[in-house]
Amino acid sequence: MYPAHLLLLLAVCVSLLGASAIPPLPLNLAQFALVIKCADKGKRPRWHYMDYGCYCGPGGSGTPIDELDRCCKTHDECYAQAEKKGCYPKLTMYSYYCGGDGPYCNSKTECQRFVCDCDVRAADCFARYPYNNKNYNINTSKRCK
């Protein structure tokens, strides 16, 4: 085997090993991003919601810092209710329709409907309230008490 071929094979193996160390984004969260886009007509990038306030993004604690953050807290609570029903909200895929008035759920199973309703309500809530750049990537240990 030629040295160039070995180098190429090594590069492929290293990149595959690196990719396997990155956890995949749960499918529902990717779908939730599309529901948000439908509700707010694409006004804001989805990543704006990944680290906003005390509740938008992983985890959450303290008092929500504004109405948009309160939407995320309510969404977290809705997912907790879904889990109590035996659903897996971060993995549950559902069927929805993006109409002129925003997203609508049309899923068949109880878990799909419940999780879809959680996401649609949160997305509609996000679309109603302003985004405050000062509340993005905040120091949660100081501001979320």
From Swiss-Prot:
It holds the Pfam family Phospholip_A2_1. PROSITE patterns: PA2_ASP (PS00119), PA2_HIS (PS00118). GO terms for cellular component: extracellular region. The keyword Cell inner membrane does not apply. Ca(2+) binds at residues 55, 57, 59, 76. Its cofactor is Ca(2+). The keyword Cell membrane does not apply. InterPro entries: PLipase_A2 (IPR001211), PLipase_A2_Asp_AS (IPR033112), PLipase_A2_dom (IPR016090), PLipase_A2_dom_sf (IPR036444), PLipase_A2_His_AS (IPR033113). It comes from the Eukaryota. Disulfide bonds join 38-98, 54-144, 56-72, 71-125, 78-118, 87-111, 105-116. The active site is at residues 75, 119. Residues 22-27 form a propeptide. GO terms for biological process: arachidonate secretion; lipid catabolic process; phospholipid metabolic process. Belongs to the phospholipase A2 family. Group I subfamily. D49 sub-subfamily. PLA2 catalyzes the calcium-dependent hydrolysis of the 2-acyl groups in 3-sn-phosphoglycerides. This is Basic phospholipase A2 PC14.
